[in-house]
């Protein structure tokens, strides 16, 4: 017998819906450029909001095209490929939208004192963009975790083994 939690599939967005979300972000202003890079990290690499909020320059190895970090939630190390579109979005943010600050966090607020985000603020900006995107949300949560589930669903559709998906998402076990 399954309990209710086990029998429900996590909500997720299709690849087209994720594309629509990304396409709906206004890249004509600094907040949009920043938010696009943040949402791309979540949608394409499956990073948790806490790991995006905590991302530092030292976590990005541009030469080897790798992001290495210690996950906030689990304390476990995680190494992911720095995908070309993700890298380009981060570079665009750093060159054209990031305020001048000595913070070692990649993503900072657009108003002084330019502090880094907390995970709730990252989740909040994802929610705002999901609501503005025009995506049909009935039965789907509007949060960053749903973007992680969406990545997992797409990987499953491409027959990526579950242990590999768990590793990508930084889960401790596949159960």
Q: Where are the regions a protein language model picked out?
A:
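Conserved catalytic core of the tyrosine transesterase superfamily
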Residues: 1-175
